[in-house]
Amino acid sequence: MTELKNDRYLRALQRQPVDVTPVWMMRQAGRYLPEYKATRAQAGDFMSLCKNAELACEVTLQPLRRYPLDAAILFSDILTIPDAMGLGLYFEAGEGPRFTSPITGKADVEKLPVPDPEQELGYVMNAVRTIRRELKGEVPLIGFSGSPWTLATYMVEGGSSKAFTVIKKMMYAESQTLHLLLDKLAKSVTLYLNAQIRAGAQSVMIFDTWGGVLTGRDYQQFSLYYMHKIVDGLLRENEGRRVPVTLFTKGGGQWLEAIAETGCDALGLDWTTDIADARRRVGHKVALQGNMDPSMLYASPARIEEEVASILAGFGNGEGHVFNLGHGIHQDVPPEHAGAFVEAVHRLSAPYHL
């Protein structure tokens, strides 16, 4: 087993004792850090940054040099899989991700390959191996993927969406086509995450960013069903250690019980879910990650500390909490506010672990 100097994060995900509540931030390697902006400028563009193992490693490590975070997360993008399937990912200034060849019907879905993660996505595995080497066992490395439903929304809509009418039209008018796409994506995500684990990811997370736009019944059928399939197919042990799995559906607070049934180790919570309520409902079964509103980082350090105290009190004593934001950190947050957040979590959580 490779030695880890700090395994708090992995222990908390398995609801084992820790000295303080571990903390990391979604998008902790990102545009709020001036050093990230400098490295991105050096890379030329976002995907060039993702595809250069040394630079992806550099931006992964940048937040760890600033803050005593309890985990590193691979610097990559959820849309690497659709890009590897040949949809032609590009980023439009102010518009976010776009695809040159979105999915328009069954013929497009049938043509899609299931990418070989060590070939078409080999650059991600190179980044994982490079980051693990450079971390030198300081903290665990988190690998990740988008969920099949969330990836499908981008692939069918052709990019970001506000109303999701194009994919919902497919869901209601051509459900077999959508199921075919989701099934291919579930296979691709399983292979991709297992390759990340073999390359050295010590925990993995599935981001279901758009699951919350569905009705309860549609969520079960078009999102959760496929995440469950992935969880069933994942390597759960590597390097002599359990590899915990976290599922995060943004806007999914009403479905926590169903998500906990998948066999995952932890649930991500967004800031609209009360953490005390979540723990009462599923805390006997899974760990919880979250869930401060990312916009709270615009507040004063004193106000941030109050919010941290309130969330810690909501979760209460004992194990099974990984502190995080309820979604990614905003790009214009002052870096010192992120530092105040991390420091407050460690300092204020110790009494809950006596």
Curated annotation (Swiss-Prot):
Location(s) in or outside the cell: Cytoplasm
CDD domains: URO-D
Coiled-coil zones: none
Pfam families named among the record's database cross-references: URO-D (PF01208)
One of the record's GO molecular function terms: uroporphyrinogen decarboxylase activity
Site label Transition state stabilizer, positions: D77
GO biological processes: protoporphyrinogen IX biosynthetic process from glutamate
Reaction equation(s) it catalyzes: uroporphyrinogen III + 4 H(+) = coproporphyrinogen III + 4 CO2
Entry EC number(s): 4.1.1.37
Binding-site positions, substrate: R27, Q28, A29, G30, R31, D77, Y154, T209, H327
Biochemical pathway: Porphyrin-containing compound metabolism; protoporphyrin-IX biosynthesis; coproporphyrinogen-III from 5-aminolevulinate: step 4/4
Gene Ontology cellular-component annotations: cytosol
Database matches in PROSITE patterns: UROD_1 (PS00906), UROD_2 (PS00907)
InterPro entries assigned to the protein according to its UniProt record, in alphabetical order: UROD/MetE-like_sf, Uroporphyrinogen_deCO2ase_HemE, Uroporphyrinogen_deCOase
Keywords: Cytoplasm, Decarboxylase, Lyase, Porphyrin biosynthesis
SUPFAM superfamilies from the UniProt entry: UROD/MetE-like
Record's keyword annotation contains DNA-binding: no
EC top class, as a word: lyase
Subunit structure: Homodimer.
Record family assignment: Belongs to the uroporphyrinogen decarboxylase family.
HAMAP family documented for this protein: URO_D
UniProt function note: Catalyzes the decarboxylation of four acetate groups of uroporphyrinogen-III to yield coproporphyrinogen-III.
Protein's name in the database: Uroporphyrinogen decarboxylase
